C-alpha cells in the first residue's frame, strides 16, 4: 500500500472504537502507517479517531476526555477566529451542533497546529497542522455520519454505554437521549452537516 500512497490526491482517515493510549500492536501499526502517509499524501482529512492517530503520529497527545464524552451528538461547537477564516469551514456557521461519538480528546497539539473549533466538552474539535509533506485537517466530530446512524449505534451499544462506560444510568436515560437527538434530526440539514467534507474535497481539487 505505502508505495501507492503518492497516487492519491488526498486521504480520509475515519473513526474507530479504539483508545489510542492503550498502545496495542494494532494501534502502533496505525500510528506507523499514518507516519508513512505524512511522507506521501499531501492532504489528509482525519476524523475522530483519525485525528487522534494523526495528532499522536505528529507528536501530540490524546487522553480520556476530562469533561465527559459525546454520545451521538456534539452541541455548540464554536469556531475560533482561525476557524472562521479556514477554508475547511467555508459557509459554516460560527456555532453548530453535529453528529459525534467520542470518549477521548486531544490534550496536546502538534507543533504549529492551528486551533479551529471547540465546545464545552472538548477544547479541540477542529485542528489544522502540517507534518512531513502533509497538511492535515482534524475533526473530533463526524460530518460524514447521519444522526439516524448515530441513534442506531447508541441502540447497538446500549448495554455497554450503561454497564461498562457508565454514560447512562438505565435504559430510560438512553431513550431520553435518543429522543433528544431525534429532535435535532428534525432541524438538521444534510448539506450544512457535510460542509466540511465538501470544502475539503474542493481543497484537494
Residue ranges and their predicted role:
Residues 2, 21-22, 55, 109, ...:
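Active-site-proximal flexible loops/turns
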Residues 12-14:
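Structural motif
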Residues 1-8:
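Short amphipathic alpha-helix with an adjacent loop that forms part of the alpha/beta core around
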Residues 79-205:
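Amide-donor transfer/coupling interface in amidating biosynthetic enzymes
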Residues 18-83:
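Cysteine-nucleophile active-site neighborhood
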Amino acid at each position: 500500500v505505502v508505495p501507492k500512497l503518492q497516487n492519491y490526491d488526498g486521504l480520509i482517515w475515519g473513526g474507530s472504537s479504539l483508545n489510542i493510549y492503550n498502545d496495542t500492536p494494532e494501534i502502533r501499526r496505525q500510528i506507523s502507517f499514518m507516519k508513512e502517509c505524512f511522507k506521501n499524501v499531501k492532504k489528509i482529512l482525519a476524523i475522530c479517531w483519525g485525528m487522534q492517530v494523526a495528532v499522536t503520529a505528529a507528536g501530540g497527545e490524546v487522553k480520556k476526555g476530562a469533561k465527559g464524552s459525546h454520545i451521538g451528538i456534539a452541541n455548540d461547537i464554536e469556531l475560533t477566529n482561525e476557524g472562521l477564516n479556514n477554508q475547511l469551514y467555508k459557509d459554516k456557521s460560527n456555532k453548530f451542533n453535529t453528529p459525534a461519538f467520542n470518549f477521548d480528546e486531544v490534550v496536546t497539539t502538534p507543533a504549529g497546529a492551528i486551533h479551529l473549533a471547540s465546545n464545552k466538552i472538548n477544547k479541540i474539535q477542529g485542528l489544522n497542522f502540517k507534518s512531513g509533506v502533509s497538511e492535515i485537517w482534524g475533526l473530533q466530530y463526524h460530518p460524514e455520519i447521519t444522526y439516524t446512524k448515530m441513534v442506531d449505534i447508541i441502540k447497538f451499544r446500549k448495554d455497554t454505554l450503561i454497564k461498562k462506560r457508565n454514560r447512562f444510568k438505565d435504559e430510560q436515560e438512553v431513550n431520553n437521549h435518543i429522543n433528544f437527538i431525534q429532535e435535532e434530526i428534525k432541524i438538521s440539514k444534510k448539506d450544512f452537516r457535510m460542509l466540511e467534507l465538501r470544502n475539503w474535497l474542493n481543497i484537494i481539487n
